[in-house]
A protein has these predicted regions:
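Acidic, low-complexity intrinsically disordered segments
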Residues: 2, 7-213
Length: 213
C-alpha cells in the first residue's frame, strides 16, 4: 500500500445525501425529529479524516443539515470532479439515496460511486442490484475500506485487494471481497471534531439539551 496517489492528489467527496430537510441519517433511528435534533455525520467524518491522513483531498458534504438540494450537490460534484464518491445510506431513505447515486454518476461518469451504511452492509448484493450505476458497497466499518479503495483507484490497482468491499465487475457480476476485521486501535483514528471544524458549520446542528453539540 501507499500513502499518496502517485501523480496528483485524488479528490474524494463523502456525501450525506439530500432527502427530507433536517433528516438525521446518523442517529440510531434515522428520521426528521420534531425537536429539530440533527446529528453530525460522525461515520463519514471519521472516513474523511482517515483519507486526509493518507494524503487525499477529501470533502465532507452534509446536504440535509446544510439545506443543499440535489441540483446544488450536483453542481458541487461537477466542480470538484471526484474520482470517488462515498454516499451514506439508511433504510428509510435507500431508494432516494440510490437515486442520488444515479444522478451523480450521470454528472461524473468517471467517478466510482460507493454506498456505505447499515442498510447496504446488511444487504450488499441487493443494494448493488438496485441500480447499475452503483459501483460498490463498503460493508461494516468503512474507514479503512474507503482509504484502501481510494489508494487502489489512484494507483490503478486491483479492487480484489480491498477488504470489506462488494463491487460490480465490467460484465455486471457482483464480487464480495473477504470481510474487513474490526478496527482494533481506535486511538489511531483522527478526531471527528476536527473534521467537523474543517468541513461543517456547527450552527447547522442541534441537540435539544445542548444546543450545538
Amino acid at each position: 500500500m501507499w500513502d499518496r496517489p502517485s501523480d496528483q492528489v485524488m479528490n474524494v467527496v463523502l456525501l450525506n445525501p439530500p432527502f427530507h430537510p433536517r433528516y438525521s441519517r446518523s442517529q440510531r433511528s434515522p428520521a426528521v425529529i420534531k425537536s429539530g435534533v440533527i446529528y453530525y455525520p460522525i461515520w463519514l467524518a471519521y472516513a474523511t479524516g482517515v483519507l486526509e491522513q493518507s494524503g487525499f483531498d477529501a470533502q465532507l458534504v452534509d446536504a440535509p443539515a446544510a439545506g443543499h438540494s440535489l441540483p446544488a450537490v450536483l453542481d458541487l460534484v461537477e466542480a470538484s470532479r471526484p474520482r470517488l464518491v462515498v454516499i451514506d445510506t439508511s433504510t428509510p431513505s435507500i431508494h432516494n439515496d440510490v437515486d442520488v447515486a444515479r444522478a451523480i454518476k450521470g454528472q461524473v461518469p468517471e467517478a466510482f460511486v460507493l454506498l456505505v451504511g447499515p442498510h447496504v452492509s446488511a444487504l450488499p448484493e441487493a443494494s448493488l442490484r438496485m441500480d447499475a450505476t452503483v459501483d460498490g458497497v463498503a460493508r461494516g466499518e468503512y474507514d479503512h475500506t474507503v482509504r484502501d479503495l481510494a489508494q487502489q483507484l489512484a494507483g490503478g490497482g486491483d479492487l480484489k485487494a480491498v477488504l470489506g468491499l462488494s463491487y460490480r465487475t465490467g460484465d455486471g457480476a457482483v464480487v464480495h471481497n473477504p470481510d474487513r476485521p474490526p478496527i482494533e486501535d481506535l486511538d489511531a483514528l483522527p478526531f471527528a471534531s476536527q473534521v467537523y471544524r474543517r468541513h461543517l458549520r456547527i450552527e447547522d446542528y442541534f441537540y435539544s439539551i445542548a444546543r450545538y453539540p
